[in-house]
Amino acid sequence: MFHLRTCAAKLRPLTASQTVKTFSQNKPAAIRTFQQIRCYSAPVAAEPFLSGTSSNYVEEMYCAWLENPKSVHKSWDIFFRNTNAGAPPGTAYQSPLSLSRSSLATMAHAQSLVEAQPNVDKLVEDHLAVQSLIRAYQIRGHHVAQLDPLGILDADLDSSVPADIISSTDKLGFYGLHESDLDKVFHLPTTTFIGGQEPALPLREIIRRLEMAYCQHIGVEFMFINDLEQCQWIRQKFETPGIMQFTNEEKRTLLARLVRSTRFEEFLQRKWSSEKRFGLEGCEVLIPALKTIIDMSSANGVDYVIMGMPHRGRLNVLANVIRKELEQIFCQFDSKLEAADEGSGDMKYHLGMYHRRINRVTDRNITLSLVANPSHLEAADPVVMGKTKAEQFYCGDTEGKKVMSILLHGDAAFAGQGIVYETFHLSDLPSYTTHGTVHVVVNNQIGFTTDPRMARSSPYPTDVARVVNAPIFHVNSDDPEAVMYVCKVAAEWRNTFHKDVVVDLVCYRRNGHNEMDEPMFTQPLMYKQIRKQKPVLQKYAELLVSQGVVNQPEYEEEISKYDKICEEAFTRSKDEKILHIKHWLDSPWPGFFTLDGQPRSMTCPSTGLEEDILTHIGNVASSVPVENFTIHGGLSRILKTRRELVTNRTVDWALAEYMAFGSLLKEGIHVRLSGQDVERGTFSHRHHVLHDQNVDKRTCIPMNHLWPNQAPYTVCNSSLSEYGVLGFELGFAMASPNALVLWEAQFGDFNNMAQCIIDQFICPGQAKWVRQNGIVLLLPHGMEGMGPEHSSARPERFLQMCNDDPDVLPNLQEENFDISQLYDCNWIVVNCSTPGNFFHVLRRQILLPFRKPLIVFTPKSLLRHPEARTSFDEMLPGTHFQRVIPEDGPAAQNPDKVKRLLFCTGKVYYDLTRERKARDMAEEVAITRIEQLSPFPFDLLLKEAQKYPNAELAWCQEEHKNQGYYDYVKPRLRTTIDRAKPVWYAGRDPAAAPATGNKKTHLTELQRFLDTAFDLDAFKKFS
């Protein structure tokens, strides 16, 4: 009866585990590897007695039949026999018959159904076997594709060979098929295109076409994608017979591009054989591959391509893809060339480039930008993505149809660097997506000297891309036409679905890691084979000559023509005496600087605002500008507090930030704030995105309701990534100087997760690449007893990387000294102690006539501190950011009586003033706050030191002595006063960890350094 009850269930498709047994069972080929399945021609409902109302009766009849088949009517006997034999219910049931001669014949026919069923089973199972075989090729065909041009290793490191698709009789046996089945014709499923216009094919032809599609020089990984339309699209591109065809003109273009790629490297080798250039030998096909992607994208409407790549083949890409003048490249090899620009410059294979030209294939304008990068592999990936996102944003390209990115990778780095994973996970996030990136992996099967088997645990270096359902196309780089086809498909995929795609160029490296390196030390067998390997240009030229596409003289003429171009450029390069790094800018800002790249002025206007603007922004910040929007009760109280502040003409930290952002939006400046939990704020103080408590996912951003024609405000919670997201925001800030781009760390302690971006891009970016950037880092910092991972943004590290000289007092009489200082520094480091100063420094960041990175150590406890308030009076027109906030209490009235002048920065000021008040030492101890640490305010601090002639000087900080600001401030203070006095220290003792995890210890340390700061005899023993 169970069988009858489950008739409907048997209509469902069988799972893979139900249909195919594992090959390891080693069953004889004749034994079926499929469970029996019924091919129903009528629905179960054809049997009226199988309804729920009759089930009890049917069960009784079935039990009786099991005990004695003769105990039930003959029609029941036939029905139960047919059903158990697998006949469909509509066929199994026979109406009760009379005992006429015709009735007996009909009954005999019904009885014969049972005997005929095995033939039906075989037919069904054979078709299922063929469908499973097709699916096996689609899923695992890439494992047996001929991808390695050297023929040494499989491109994947998976030691198991898919036995069900290898070219042997095992293939048939695995699916229960025989040699005799090879010429049988099978209907093709809808999930394959190998038939073209034919609905059925012989098994032999099915296998041949599958092997042509999936097991030649292209390996396709796509069946993990969970979108049927996308899978069908890929199947159609690779399975359709004859789809990979090229015209003779396309073949000649491909040959010409290979000539340029190959002869460029050979020219460099001839002229500068002992120079490092990280040549492309062994993967010369990369150049035509990139040009194909760009051609296809241009044809689809893309007019701006932003690229990122490592050093391998970079000069070739600059020369033959971006089309940088060859003489500008060649002159970089001249050791006598002088650098005319400020800054230190960088190696030629790190430089970027920006170029606008006509694409000759599509006859359309296209802009190409190659982003400069350090040697830190893959570090430029998120930077490229951020720049791409920004360019899309500024031109209103909401679908990525005009601007796109191409990222090049090495196989070892693509598998080994975590930033690749972080970047992939930004690809589909609404505020970070670039609507698809084409990734090209130069898979030369070695990482410097490391074998792939020691460099990754995954079969392919590209397996990381599977996490975002990106299709992966592996291709043998010694088959240029296969490479071109794959690149066309990749560009079409990106244009169609606006998702990432990976092209894995399986190639080799003809030389060592660089031209001076000896690879035979570590890869002797591989390099013996490489020495025998015929270059891909020679192979392809011979193929085209044999096909009659070109003749030998035409081929040789193409070579000599490009060689002549190189020689002429080499001659011109000798005339270059000065190296202008600015010619290698990857992100020019038209109109922002003068024609020679200088600021249009060296002044900064007031950063204050009219009171009506402050009031208007404050009112919007304390309201909900959308009707029928229910906010949380706790948020209502926060907005009420904001309204009271505005009424009282004061701001707290959150309101000061709001006013800075809102005023810039009014001036047409886009503001983008990104980071973990920034919409609400880690400390629940910001609340820039309001959530309706009654409607799911309904939100409101009041900042976008300030003015009728304001610039848009973007605030976006990021993924839990620092390295990737900070790199992304840096790239976003590269695109335009007229945007305030901020990244906020959840806690300042976590900025070191993005240390590479800070050390290699933000700090030295202008010095290396003459590229300014105005990104702002907001780093919550403060010793508040929260333990070693929630206390310190490591200010000592940022200050240690500042480029000013601690031992040289600058010319304090210079006109606009403060602005000149800002122009000369590599970044600005501030620690504001008031909301008003925070407001001013954010506005100054945009009003300056140039751009510098801004590092802000933001407070935590000050966000709600009752004394951390600023009056509107300090934010009105005529007010500025205060680099130093001097003492303004009783000590300032009688400076001669002051016995100690304490210098400090940030939150510790409030601890010091509280302690000073408790000790009643307001006339004896003056406290001066240094708000801008770098560039150091020598001029203002000199005035402060001179103001208190009888006071001893001390630096006070809450951080440990070997951390914080002391080592940076002390030598500069000493230089300021011409070393006339010592600069004493009041703060925590040196320590390995940034802070204690014990609350009592924290408070004890705090009181100890406060005692030192106000003990006027504390330093006498050292005098």
From Swiss-Prot:
Residues with Phosphoserine modification: 100
Binding site for Mg(2+): 411, 444, 446
Protein activity control: Calcium ions and ADP stimulate, whereas ATP and NADH reduce catalytic activity.
One Gene Ontology term of the molecular function aspect: oxoglutarate dehydrogenase (NAD+) activity
Tissue expression profile of the protein: The OGDH-containing OGDHC complex is present in the brain and in the heart.
Record-linked InterPro entries: 2-oxogl_dehyd_N, 2oxoglutarate_DH_E1, DH_E1, KGD_C_sf, ODO-1/KGD_C, THDP-binding, Transketolase-like_Pyr-bd
Domain of life: Eukaryota
Name this polypeptide is given: 2-oxoglutarate dehydrogenase complex component E1
Organism: Rattus norvegicus
Lineage: Eukaryota, Metazoa, Chordata, Craniata, Vertebrata
